[in-house]
A protein has these predicted regions:
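Amphipathic alpha-helical coiled-coil segments
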Residues: 25-27, 107-115
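Residue-identity detector for glycine
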Residues: 3, 34-35, 55, 76, ...
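Long, contiguous binding/interaction regions
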Residues: 5, 17, 36-48, 65-73, ...
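Short, flexible helix-adjacent loops and helix caps
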Residues: 1-5, 83, 87-90, 116
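Conserved alpha-helical segments that form or flank metal/cofactor-binding pockets of metalloenzymes
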Residues: 1, 6-43
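Acidic/histidine-rich alpha-helical segments that form the ligand environment
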Residues: 24, 28, 45-99
């Protein structure tokens, strides 16, 4: 992103770090439960649910709208995962998921304020 709001938008780096940390926690939890983790870019592509945007560079406003929509969708996926954890009495993963839901809702709020501000 470029322009007069570059510094404000640079705060999105914090969101990227949160998401990266979340993926690390997910992989660690999967391994603790005896599961497999993603092994390659192809593996990621085959399992991803949020669509990539491979178009030409979008304007900043459109990018923020897309990020907000992605976070809203991720919140729904996390809530579904939490329900699954509850059904299987997996308290530890449910607890992690609660934190991730909170972080995702916070990112959505931040993006909404930036978009509407």
């Amino acid at each position: 992103m470029t322009g007069r709001h570059f510094r404000d938008y640079h705060l999105l780096d914090e969101q990227a770090e949160q998401i990266f940390d979340m993926t690390d926690d997910i992989a660690e939890r999967a391994r603790k439960l005896g599961g497999a983790t993603l092994r390659s870019i192809r593996d990621i592509v085959q399992h991803q649910r949020l669509k990539d945007n491979n178009g030409d560079q979008a304007d900043a406003h459109r990018m923020l709208l897309e990020l907000r929509a992605d976070n809203l969708q991720l919140t729904g996926y996390l809530r579904a995962a939490h329900s699954l954890c509850d059904r299987h009495n997996d308290v530890a993963t449910a607890s992690l998921t609660e934190n991730w839901i909170d972080q995702t809702e916070r990112r959505t709020w931040f993006l909404s304020e930036t978009i509407n501000g």
